[in-house]
């Protein structure tokens, strides 16, 4: 790690917010809920099958998605696909919420880390298989060990370096997408 980078944890960088499900107390609001089923195999958000349910208006006010939020699968997964899959929400704020099988990481200080950089950072950790060490399994359901997940070290370069890293990653992914389409 370069000397100019700093090290912190997810719990210091982000607010973690648990998801919700159907409401019990009126007034209700009918909203779209992002679920594990909306995570694509390439870690994107699939809008084609969003579940719309009635949730408590007061709860939705505290648990709606904001542009730049990271949605983390905390329950579900499988032996081949551990929990911890993360997607970046790049949509309008206040439109959707997220299910009780997920949680959101919301960056506390945008002058510290870019949400896209953190998304790619967590994706790299996931792809290396490190999430397997941060899960438990009971009756076939895999659960993220939140304390381990939120305590993992995050190495942070300057914002300008983060922007350069994100740009390089996205250039590579664009090239790969073009290659895949041409096959």
Q: Whereabouts are the PLM-identified features?
A:
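Short coil/turn segments at secondary-structure boundaries
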Residues: 23-30, 49, 133-135, 181
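Non-catalytic DNA-recognition/assembly elements of restriction-modification systems
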Residues: 1-20, 151, 155-167, 171-183
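Sequence-specific dsDNA recognition surfaces
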Residues: 11-23, 37-70, 77-80
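Short, intrinsically disordered, mixed-charge
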Residues: 120-127, 171-174
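A generic structural signal for alpha-helix starts
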Residues: 5, 109, 113, 126, ...
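A short glycine-rich beta-alpha junction/loop motif
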Residues: 95-103, 131, 135-156
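A short beta-sheet element
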Residues: 35, 60-123, 145-146
């Amino acid at each position: 790690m370069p000397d100019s980078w700093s090290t912190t944890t997810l719990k210091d960088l982000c607010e973690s917010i648990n998801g919700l499900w159907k409401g019990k107390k009126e007034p209700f609001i009918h909203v779209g809920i992002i679920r594990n089923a909306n995570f694509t195999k390439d870690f994107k958000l699939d809008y084609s099958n969003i579940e719309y349910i009635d949730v408590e208006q007061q709860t939705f006010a505290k648990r709606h998605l904001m542009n730049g939020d990271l949605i983390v699968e905390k329950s579900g997964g499988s032996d081949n696909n551990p929990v911890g899959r993360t997607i970046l929400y790049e949509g309008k704020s206040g439109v959707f919420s997220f299910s009780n099988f997920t949680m959101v990481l919301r960056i506390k200080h945008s002058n510290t880390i870019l949400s896209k950089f953190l998304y790619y950072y967590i994706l790299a950790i996931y792809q290396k298989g490190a999430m397997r060490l941060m899960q438990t399994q009971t009756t076939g359901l895999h659960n993220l060990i939140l304390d381990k997940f939120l305590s993992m070290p995050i190495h942070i370069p300057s914002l300008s370096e983060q922007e350069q890293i994100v740009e390089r990653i996205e250039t590579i992914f664009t090239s790969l997408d073009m290659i895949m389409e041409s096959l």
